[in-house]
Amino acid sequence: MAELVHDPVNRVRYAFQRDGENLIVDCAVDSGGSLPAHRHPRQVERWSVLDGQIRFRLGNTERLIGSADGEMVVTSDTDHGLANVSGREAHLRCRVEPALRLQAFLEESAAAARERLFTARGLPRGLAGARWAATFLERYATRQSFLNRRNSCSAP
């Protein structure tokens, strides 16, 4: 398995594997860990739960999914998020089509989480956090994400 990238704020560990222009992301989500609601303007995600129970939010709908439930497809520009409700570590796989800069986005945000540059609610922590957030948004946010904020964040 590839080297794991740890995000202590969301309580997730990622392993990345390129598949042509796509990206496979294996996620180990701690009990109670989550990925907050967000959207990808130009990417499709295909999520599979390998082990555990996940509360998956897709648009305005929430449902519990496990390994027997098959693949959850998230079309581009659709709000989505998830939380591990297993009471133990859960394992998921996500195929991202196309990869674009998602791996760099997740690696950089996980590094900032390890440096405690933002809070569990995603707010910058102090001046260093504000500087990091400004440069991070400059690199990764799209103009559309600012126009369509609707309480979510766009990720590449």
Task: Locate predicted features.
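Solvent-exposed residues in well-ordered beta-strands and their adjoining turns
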Residues: 28-32, 59, 85, 95-97
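Short acidic-glycine-tyrosine-enriched beta hairpin
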Residues: 18-21, 46, 53, 59-79
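Acidic/histidine-enriched, glycine/proline-rich intrinsically disordered or flexible terminal extensions
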Residues: 108-156
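A short glycine-rich, His/Asp/Glu-containing loop-to-beta-strand
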Residues: 3-37, 43
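Beta-strand secondary-structure signal
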Residues: 24-28, 46, 55, 91-93
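Ligand-binding loop in jelly-roll beta-barrel domains
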Residues: 76-105
